[in-house]
Amino acid sequence: MKYNMWFMFIVAVLIVSQITGADPGPLVLFYNSPAVYQSDVTSNEALPIGNGKLAAMVYGGMSEEIIQFNEDTVWAGHPHDYAHAGAAGYLQQIRDYVWAGQGRAAWNAAANTFMSVPLRQCPYQPTAELRLAFNHSGTTNYRRQLDLTTATASVRYTTGGVTYSRDYFASYPDNVIVVRLTAGQAGKISFTCSLTTPHTVVSNSVSGNDVVLRGAVDHVGRNGLASDIEFETRVRILCEGGSISSSGQSLVVSQADAVTLVLGAASNFVNYNDISGDPGSLCLQTVADAAAKGFPALRQAQLNDYQALFNRVTLDLGTSDKTNNPTNERLDAIEAGVDAAKNDWSLFNADDLQLVALNFQMARYLLISGSRPGSQPLGLQGKWNNELEPSWEGKMTLNINEEMNYWAAEVTNLAECHQPLLDLTRDLSETGAVVANVHYDADGWMVHHNTDLWRGAAPINNAGGLWPTGAAWLCMHLWWHYEYGGDVNYLEEVYPLMKGAAEFFADTLVQDPRPGSAGYLLTNPTHSPEQPNPALGDDGEIVAGTTMDSQLIRGLFTYVMKAGEILDVDADFRQQLQQMRAQLPPNQIGRYGQLQEWLEDVDVPNTHRHLSHLVDLMPAGNITPHHTPEMAAAAEVVLNWKGDDTNNTAWSQAWKMCCRTRLLQGNHAYMILNKILAKSHTDNMTFSRKGNENQIDGNLGVLMGTAEMFLQSHQGEVYLLPALPDKMVAGSVTGLRARGGFTVGITWQNNALSTATIYSSRGSTCRIRSAWPIVVAEGTKSVALQSPGENLYEFTTQAGHIYTVTAYSCPIPIPYDLDNDCQVNFTDFVVLASEWIDNGGGEGVDLADLAQLALDWLECRRDPAGTCWQ
């Protein structure tokens, strides 16, 4: 076989050159001018940094730098029980109105007797601003950037023949924000440093090399609750060369070679019912400890911590010279392309796949920067807020937005960043137990559609807040964390929370008493978020038994039953839940072929932003094209009604994108993604918005929608490339997680799977769904596969082992009659071709011809129809 090794080498080189992705491009946002500062407005241009507890916006000014920052427990209000005493005494009256179809009477009764006290919750607050006055002018070569690989914002410019540089990062290990100032010449760094706040200044002074500001929140939100949060922020200046002097409440740095600023902040918040903390001593100790380490050690600790999370996942969709353009111009180009295409998506030609990858990693960056163990969970604006009255108070909205913030935490390998939401759920199980008792005379716990720093759980704003299934949705996340990680000790810890949520519904679900009804167990009163039942007119806001509620409760009962079985506890309660689950209304298909939003078939086509009755499609994963095709088709009818326009909010568009990926409609999801990039992203890619209403949930929802183009794992399957858009011809992703304890990397070429690697952390059975035939190996050893169904491949794994998945050819006839059977895979092809050459076959066919033939074969194996061979 004298040609065998050469032939295999040539083919291997050619194939690898095709499969290997190009340079994924720089994961950097950059701009050629500073961000514009406005007081009491959260910037859509400044660059965000954060460590979970501290969050800052960097504006990059030359004459004056402003770093607006938040400490995530600085809110209006004080510890407060929002429950409405005596509310349970009116519950039956409200229910009776609903059963009688008198929803307006139910609304009025609830408004007077059942709502939160006060009616609104408290707003998240800005903390302070670090101001550095340079008085630089006449600058050139300006560049402002955010490097996602190092979590570092930077500013560079030249003035007076000197190039100045500033780098900014937030350290989770040291809980400080660090600013590093350098210059191209020694002795050129001079500035004045001060701290300001929009709140009451208790004291503002200089202490040694520190500027210290003590403040008290004085803003009273629209609910009228007095604000009792106090805080301290302190910046320490570490000079290399030059001098430091004081000037009133500021410090002046003169002619330094380099400077490090260490900024900390703390409040008197201990937990939602304790504000006895000492912010002064805590802030002083934090800043002193960090400053003592010095800049190199601070930097290394920050990088080690951040990159251990960020580097877990890579996404390579290729790159182009578009990466040479400022980020805002790239977004503008996509917007121009979307506008030019109008309603004919085939005309869209402004693809920027590297920007798609950048957007994906930007969302992961925001999740890391805004949500870490020990911090508060992300709210509607994440952690970055410069407004005393942010939109919707910057709270945690539980009927879609808060959960969307965390949909992608597990799949994008940031399970630690999920922890603040899980901690919030634990807090709400306590305040929600009070509301369950006071409002519903029920055991267990529940929460309505919003909460704040003080963990309010009662219904707020108006009677439309009577949405009782917040706990059920939050418990979905408790269960997901177990599904991905498999830690039984964790499951033991959270099982009481899940059980408590189920106990509430076991106490409060009521059998439909209306004549002619099917006697289902229903929630009453309830509300489908922002949507009245169209058949009831003014009586349609407060109803019984929405589809969303039934989906969430059915899911909750299922999680609790599974968890109880794993832990071998509460057999009788599991039996009760099983019986009650069978009495919940099923998903129903209506007269238009739509998935019904209501118990009755009364849906009217509409474009409203909420997709509440599609929870079973996304995020729950109980509706899928393969397992429930009729319901999947019914969900698609609803999505087609809703449309893809961005006149709704970005979170709604992100939800639609996620739904399309769940329906395996990658091209449609990609279209929505580009519309979001065009119309709903701000220049800094930080907030998705409607008008000036800044929100972060759209960013994080798109993160989930993008990840699930490449990998989905509900229904017990590791689904490879389930919704790959046609425009993503070649690429790779590494580090995504699948349920069952798997970490997955995938490479594709010509829109088809090439290879995948699967790391098994738990030794679970792995069931793969793949549109392409596959073989699996561990090292050089083939792994036996079972086929439990079409396009399904199942094999056993061992904990700590890595498995390689390789897609092979669709059965095709091999030219030159190499084999009588003519049905071979690639390995067979190489061996047979080599033997054929050795035996003198193929007169007039040389080695190069066969190498090209192998590449042709490679093309064909990614074409399931085999049309290239016809």
How would you name each of these model-derived features?
Residues N401, G470-H481, Y490-D507, S652, ...:
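Extended, hydrophobic alpha-helical segments in both membrane/secreted and soluble proteins
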Residues I19-S33, I812-Q823, Q870:
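Boundary/junction segments of secreted and surface-exposed precursor proteins
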Residues A22-A463, W480-Y482, Y490, K499, ...:
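Aromatic-residue-lined binding/catalytic grooves and analogous aromatic/hydrophobic interfacial grooves
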Residues A46-Q68, T73, T113-F114, P126, ...:
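C-terminal capping/lid segments that line or modulate ligand- or cofactor-binding pockets
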Residues M1-M5:
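Positively charged n-region of N-terminal signal peptides that target proteins for export
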Residues F7-S17:
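Bacterial N-terminal signal peptides
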Residues G741-V744, W748-A756, C766, I774-V776, ...:
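Extracytoplasmic low-complexity repetitive segments enriched in small/polar residues
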Residues L818-W869:
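Alpha-helical segments with a strong preference for the paired helices of cellulosomal dockerin domains
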